Amino acid sequence: MYRYISVSEELSSPYLGRYRSFGFAAQREAAGHWQVVCKVSDVSTDPVFVENLAARCTAGQLEPVHLMDIIEDALI
């Protein structure tokens, strides 16, 4: 079983300065514990967008190998 969670990050860019962004962590349940199997950083500055997409990925039990494609499609 997989679950996807939003991850808040404080980042810095030479063009933007400091900013808060949100990424994803894919976790797999193993022996009663959740282990991170994949992380994608700096997806969006909109926390609701990332949380909603994470919930859809969890509900659909998305394989982490497809996460980048799903994120790209959602951003277009």
Model-derived segments and spans:
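Short N-terminal "domain-start" leader segments
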Residues: 1-23
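Residue-level marker of intrinsically disordered, low-complexity segments enriched
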Residues: 3-5, 34-38, 68-69
